[in-house]
Amino acid sequence: MATEYASSGEYIKHHLQNLTYGQHADGTWGFAHGAEEAKAMGFWAINVDSMLFSIGLGVLFLFLFRLAAKKATVGVPTGLQNFVEWVIEFIDTSVRGSFSHQNALVAPLALTVFMWVFLMNLMDLLPVDWLPYVATMAGIPYLKVVPSTDPNVTFGLSLSIFFLVLYYSVKMKGAGGFFSELAFQPFPKFLFPVNLLLEGVGLIAKPISLALRLFGNMYAGEMIFILIALMFGGGWVLALFGGALQWAWAVFHILIITLQAFIFMTLTIVYLDMAHAEHH
């Protein structure tokens, strides 16, 4: 597929472009025909591919775990049940080790975050040309299949966690306690403007770093796969080397995929634990 483009730059730009729907400059609504047109659509434009893949993978997660729960047996687990039980035990251990309070929401939330992010990251292991080529044959000009390479998705996830942190911070400590936590430490109370600035920046940095860490790592991984795919258009020697390189990077990328999902989940638990901690 790389040979169908006029240049390597055009190939890369195509694979990094989302299928974006929004309002055109003339007031009509439709899909963007390039990066500039997508940018001109503004804030309310929707990356349709990111939405469809992220929602679809979320539904897949619910379906698989629901199926495993319905078919669970008291004997030795096998197949899907074995995998689901292992994941749940892993999440339970992680929550017990990082969350020191009582909240029935945290463990299911941690499970959902881990599996959802993992499945979105896992899409990066699909060959970069497969689904975009099928989409092109169906008349769809652009298709990005890895939702976690879209900052809109990663920021949506991190902001959801951030709002939960704010909610539990106020619920557990009260509005006054939460404010005093921001304004009266680490320096003496008369320096509350400095404290408020420092703690406020630290608070806002949490969702930003959470989103950018996931986005940056997955975007870089996708870019490497795209660059390797370019080698298949450079003759059989480069194609052979590219195939070996792609396999090696895919094996290594499995670690990155899992690690990024684990980090996102762990930081979610830690932030919620901090929100539940009593103010002193």
UniProtKB/Swiss-Prot annotation:
GO cellular component: plasma membrane; proton-transporting ATP synthase complex
Biological process annotations from GO: proton motive force-driven plasma membrane ATP synthesis
Subcellular location: Cell inner membrane
Membrane-spanning ranges: 45-65, 105-125, 126-146, 159-179, 190-210, 223-243, 250-270
UniProt keyword list: ATP synthesis, Cell inner membrane, Cell membrane, CF(0), Hydrogen ion transport, Ion transport, Membrane, Transmembrane, Transmembrane helix, Transport
Pfam families: ATP-synt_A
GO molecular function: proton-transporting ATP synthase activity, rotational mechanism
Protein family membership: Belongs to the ATPase A chain family.
Assembly with partners or alone: F-type ATPases have 2 components, CF(1) - the catalytic core - and CF(0) - the membrane proton channel. CF(1) has five subunits: alpha(3), beta(3), gamma(1), delta(1), epsilon(1). CF(0) has three main subunits: a(1), b(2) and c(9-12). The alpha and beta chains form an alternating ring which encloses part of the gamma chain. CF(1) is attached to CF(0) by a central stalk formed by the gamma and epsilon chains, while a peripheral stalk is formed by the delta and b chains.
Family annotation (NCBIfam families): ATP_synt_6_or_A, PRK05815.1-1
Protein name: ATP synthase subunit a
